[in-house]
């Protein structure tokens, strides 16, 4: 089983207790617990549908998520009728923030509150028709006849979903909808995530074709988008093996890059959008 695709995919969903006597992991969409002292393996039930691992080409439509409380506990943000709403906890009064969400261009249920509880961020998503490939299982274990399977899989030239990170101020209702020229040829947009000072959000842009990858910052004050990092390649930017860690002060971040032909870590200055220094070096 160790060499199977399923096991490799789920290996990251593994945890060990502080006493090092209990191991929990996910395999084939089931939760398992191994107690080493009893040498006992227990099935703890199925993984909820929302948390199940998907094929890497399956698109998350981001339509379903729990309401999100603000850090100060005074508000709850949620999606209703494809738009962003907030509810005041003390009074139960609802307020609609976005007005332009539709079935064909809706707001993501993955809402992020600013640390100061004054703003929310979410992506506006333009979905596309899902594409599939089909394959035949010639000798299924549970029946004599072959089985036809289908797998969601976008092929070269197929249209892809388009995401626009947006910010809304709770009290004023002001919207910050950015220009998209720095992320207009999307394979994927990841984020947004709030900066510690609540003045901007950060998101990542993976350009279709994988020759450009950017870390971008959207100002909650001006609505302008600026690049913090840009990786380019004539062949391929390895987006599956990158790493970013934002430092708590909001002024620096650690970034992994292959720009010197080796995969190394850099300390980036978020203010200047330039590397302060290279953390690791060498032909390794």
Predicted regions and their residues:
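Beta-propeller folds
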Residues: 4-284
């Amino acid at each position: 089983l160790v060499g199977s695709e399923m096991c490799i995919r789920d290996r990251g969903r593994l945890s060990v207790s502080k006493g090092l006597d209990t191991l929990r992991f996910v395999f084939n969409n089931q939760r398992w617990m191994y107690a080493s002292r009893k040498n006992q393996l227990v099935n703890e039930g199925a993984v909820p549908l929302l948390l199940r691992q998907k094929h890497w080409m399956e698109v998350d439509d981001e339509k379903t998520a729990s309401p999100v409380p603000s850090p100060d506990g005074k508000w709850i943000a949620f999606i209703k009728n494809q738009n962003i709403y907030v509810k005041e906890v003390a009074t139960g009064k609802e307020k609609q923030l976005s007005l332009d969400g539709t079935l064909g261009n809706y707001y993501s249920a993955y809402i992020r509150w600013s640390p100061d509880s004054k703003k929310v961020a979410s992506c506006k998503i333009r979905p596309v028709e899902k594409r599939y490939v089909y394959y035949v299982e010639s000798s299924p274990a549970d029946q004599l006849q072959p089985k036809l399977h289908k797998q969601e899989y976008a092929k070269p030239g197929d249209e892809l979903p388009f995401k626009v990170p947006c910010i809304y101020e709770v009290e004023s209702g002001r919207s910050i909808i950015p220009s998209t020229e720095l992320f207009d040829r999307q394979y994927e947009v990841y984020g947004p995530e709030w900066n510690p000072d609540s003045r901007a959000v950060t998101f990542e842009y993976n350009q279709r074709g994988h020759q450009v990858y950017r870390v971008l910052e959207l100002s909650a004050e001006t609505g302008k988008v600026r690049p913090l990092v840009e990786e380019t390649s004539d062949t391929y930017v390895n987006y599956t093996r990158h790493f970013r860690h934002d430092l708590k002060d909001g002024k620096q971040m650690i970034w992994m890059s292959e720009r010197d032909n080796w995969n190394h870590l850099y300390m980036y200055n978020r203010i200047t959008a330039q590397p302060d220094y290279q953390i690791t070096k060498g032909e390794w």
